[in-house]
Amino acid sequence: LTCVTDKSFGGVNTEECAAGQKICFKNWKKMGPKLYDVKRGCTATCPKADDDGCVKCCNTDK
């Protein structure tokens, strides 16, 4: 499985998931007007969202 770890104007960065990590996740929370803290990567289980954040998980490449 290959997950996106970062998106920018220059393209995307990806990582190959380790054995046992079969889910890609995107975790983001609002830090201010039009400002978000975003984390992406591989995981074994879908993480829970913080009170002021959101999480999206999938099990397909990129």
Swiss-Prot record:
Keywords assigned: Disulfide bond, Secreted, Toxin
Species assigned in the record: Dendroaspis jamesoni kaimosae
Superkingdom per UniProt: Eukaryota
Family: Belongs to the three-finger toxin family. Short-chain subfamily. Aminergic toxin sub-subfamily.
InterPro entries: Snake_3FTx, Snake_toxin-like_sf, Snake_toxin_con_site, Toxin_cobra-type
GO cellular component, as recorded: extracellular region
Pfam families per record: Toxin_cobra-type
Protein known as: Synergistic-type venom protein S2C4
